[in-house]
């Protein structure tokens, strides 16, 4: 017994020693980790107040390391695995530098923070050559819209009025606009500023006269594609013109208009660009020459030192660099193709920069080879004309030329590059643009083509700090409230984009534009999230109130109980033009709505029953049989609104035709053929009777059979 007790004591002692030894070994095996990446040790800021978060790899508590700043305009805030560095606005005229000293028991780092001052660059502007008089072959006189308004330097945005051909009638093409000059200064190029509506230029020719040659000489043929943005075009050769003649052959909606026509001589003295090219490989300043010295960099204007230094020491933030230095692809003219395809205008904001500005911000835009194409930048802000905030359909537009451009923002907004042209033109090549550090603030965007994954979407939307965030699909652009978008789709954006792209592409199938989209026309439909209203469609955009984003973006909801009807209905408004006439505005587009819910494969079609069987006593609305066979009413009297429209009933006519020819397989090309025929055989008036009869005739031709009985049954 004594031996047993003795043995037990020895065993306990042995176990205690083992445990104690294990504890010592465990404590000794813990290695302190405290690492800051080398690329984070240099931080550059522009003049504005800002902050950046630096990742720290560590297993230490916040209390076990510290960060101290060396100047009062600089602050450092410690977190578990990161360090936030903040700077005040630099209101001085000089660059300033300070340090953040970070220390732990094992590692010490010095983070060098440089903040640059306000832009000090001076742009050598080209020389404007002003006409002293002008003459037009036709112009509106009541009210006065004479050609003088196109060279008075008073833009519409500033309270001016444009030149406009006669109202209420198609222009007598070609419309001739002549501008008269002293003839003492070369003219190299001109900028055509549009009237944001009717009359934007399509095709035209330009001719010039000189003191030596009083006969007009052809300078070139141009096509501005009726796009609603300033367009720049060069003359074939510089000329000291006494007259410049525009022979306009086409304009939007059959009119001709011009806000301002400006003529310029290029400034041959451009010391800034010459200086930049001693350091950078090209004028976009996106890469420095390999043998550049710090002395050469320091000789640049202060504004460009920041960019050159960031490129030289590889401290240009990768996220910022992705959106500040980009190649922008060409897009078609949404105005031109709306006319050709008989649709409402698609969006033309296809090229977001991911950079926003505040009112008063100065932004430098560096433009590379334009390949002779016309580009500009547009600042899209908000409008409140309806009593609530929503994204504007257009904003201040700044024409861009190759080289250094500088603009001052008149409002807070997102910058979009406007590069709209004939995309089949061999010269329609990507254009490289750099918006350097210190100009605007990066918010970013998500592009399905570029970023591709849900993980990348989450990373980008988490970094964004602007009110709106842009998601680019193949056919749709969602420009929605950042906060509500993130709440509705925190991660799985790919399924949302797929649904919206599909809705648009299915509708395009019915329209028969497979030979057009995207080879000739490649614009997106542009969706916004107003803070009032509900769902609607207009020229250039469709709207969904920001409180329903969860309903229209989540796949599980959109696929259930015909919830895709609303989005498909609004997209249908964009596409319905060829089969629409007065009294069908809210019903002809429902061909697309019904087709969408059919393609989703979840639900039956929607609309009033054609007849009421005995067991359907719960049907409250009048049916086709009741309207035609009991009341003997015509199509235009089916409804009770001011146009006689009954959307639920009228929508059934197109859907009957689709079911018979497409679903039953009698002619699966019926609707694509019908849309093409309607585009080829347009009615020149808005008269609903003429349009209705044209629809019936073209439907017979598309079906290759007589549908008279069918349309008579529908009250034609």
Q: Over which residues does each language-model region extend?
A:
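Beta-strand-enriched, solvent-exposed domains that form extended recognition/catalytic surfaces
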Residues: 275-444
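Aromatic, loop-rich ligand-recognition surfaces of beta-strand-rich domains
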Residues: 158-213, 229-274
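A short beta-strand micro-motif common to beta-rich folds, especially ectodomain repeats
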Residues: 94-105
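Surface-exposed binding patches on compact interaction domains or structured appendages
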Residues: 55-84
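Pan-zinc metallopeptidase signature
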Residues: 272-328, 334, 653-716
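Catalytic cores of extracellular degradative/oxidative enzymes
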Residues: 457-659, 668-671
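Bacterial Sec-dependent N-terminal signal peptides
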Residues: 13-42, 105-129, 268-274
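Solvent-exposed, low-complexity, repeat-rich "mucin-like" stalks and linkers
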Residues: 27, 37-66, 365, 692
């Amino acid at each position: 017994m004594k031996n047993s007790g003795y043995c037990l004591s020895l065993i306990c002692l042995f176990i205690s020693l083992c445990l104690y030894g294990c504890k010592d070994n465990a404590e000794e095996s813990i290695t302190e980790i405290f690492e800051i990446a080398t690329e984070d040790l240099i931080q550059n800021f522009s003049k504005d107040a800002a902050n950046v978060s630096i990742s720290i790899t560590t297993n230490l508590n916040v209390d076990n390391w510290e960060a101290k700043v060396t100047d009062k305009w600089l602050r450092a805030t410690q977190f578990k695995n990161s360090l936030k560095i903040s700077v005040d606005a630099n209101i001085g005229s000089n660059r300033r530098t300070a340090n953040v000293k970070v220390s732990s028991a094992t590692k010490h780092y010095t983070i060098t923070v440089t903040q640059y001052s306000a832009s000090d660059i001076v742009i050598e502007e080209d020389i404007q050559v002003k006409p002293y008089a002008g003459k037009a072959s036709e112009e509106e006189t009541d009210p006065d819209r004479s050609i003088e308004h196109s060279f008075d330097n008073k833009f519409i945005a500033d309270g001016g009025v444009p030149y406009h051909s006669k109202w209420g009638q198609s222009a007598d093409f070609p419309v001739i606009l002549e501008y008269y000059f002293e003839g003492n200064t070369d003219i190299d190029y001109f900028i055509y500023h549009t009237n944001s509506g009717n009359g934007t230029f399509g095709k035209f020719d330009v001719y010039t006269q000189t003191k030596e040659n009083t006969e007009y000489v052809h300078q070139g043929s141009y096509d501005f594609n009726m796009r609603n943005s300033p367009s720049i075009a060069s003359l074939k050769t510089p000329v000291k013109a006494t007259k410049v003649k525009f022979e306009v052959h086409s304009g939007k909606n059959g009119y001709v208009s011009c806000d301002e026509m400006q003529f310029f001589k290029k400034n041959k003295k451009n010391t800034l660009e010459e200086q930049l090219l001693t350091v950078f490989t090209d004028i976009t300043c996106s890469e420095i020459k390999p043998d550049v010295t710090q002395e050469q960099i320091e000789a640049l204007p202060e504004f460009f030192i920041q960019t050159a230094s960031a490129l030289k020491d590889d401290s240009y933030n990768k996220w910022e660099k992705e959106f500040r230095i980009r190649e922008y692809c060409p897009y078609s003219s949404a105005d031109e193709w709306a006319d050709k395809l008989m649709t409402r205008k698609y969006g033309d904001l296809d090229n977001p920069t991911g950079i926003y500005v505040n009112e008063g911000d100065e932004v430098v835009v560096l433009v590379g080879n334009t390949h002779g194409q016309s580009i500009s930048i547009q600042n899209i802000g908000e409008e409140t004309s309806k009593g609530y905030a929503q994204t504007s359909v257009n904003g201040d537009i700044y024409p861009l030329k190759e080289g250094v451009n500088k603009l001052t923002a008149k409002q807070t907004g997102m910058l979009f590059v406007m590069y709209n042209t004939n995309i089949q033109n061999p010269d329609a090549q990507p254009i490289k643009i750099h918006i350097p550090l210190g100009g605007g603030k990066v918010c970013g965007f998500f592009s399905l083509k570029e970023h591709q994954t849900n993980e990348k979407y989450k990373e980008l939307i988490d970094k964004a700090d602007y009110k709106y965030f842009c998601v680019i699909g193949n056919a749709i652009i969602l420009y929605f409230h950042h906060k509500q978008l993130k709440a509705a789709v925190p991660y799985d954006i790919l399924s949302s984009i797929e649904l919206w792209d599909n809705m648009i592409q299915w509708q395009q199938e019915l329209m028969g534009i497979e030979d057009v989209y995207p080879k000739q026309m490649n614009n997106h439909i542009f969706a916004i999230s107003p803070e009032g209203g509900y769902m609607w469609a207009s020229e250039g955009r469709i709207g969904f109130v920001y409180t329903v984003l969860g309903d229209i973006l989540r796949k599980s909801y959109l696929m259930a109980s015909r919830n895709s009807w609303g989005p498909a209905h609004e997209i249908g408004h964009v596409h319905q033009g060829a089969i629409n006439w007065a009294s069908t505005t809210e019903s002809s587009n429902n061909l697309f709505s019904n087709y969408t819910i059919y393609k989703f494969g979840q639900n039956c079609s929607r609309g009033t029953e054609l007849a009421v069987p005995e067991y359907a006593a719960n049907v409250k609305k009048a049916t086709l049989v009741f309207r035609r066979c009991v009341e003997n009413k015509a199509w235009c009297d089916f409804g009770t609104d001011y146009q006689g429209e009954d959307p639920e009933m009228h929508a059934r006519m197109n859907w009957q035709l689709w079911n018979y020819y497409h679903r039953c397989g009698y002619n699966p090309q019926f609707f694509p053929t019908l849309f093409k025929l309607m585009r080829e055989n347009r009615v020149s008036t808005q008269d609903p009777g003429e349009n209705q009869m044209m629809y019936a005739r073209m439907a017979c031709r598309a079906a290759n059979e007589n549908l008279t009985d069918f349309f008579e049954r529908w009250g034609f």
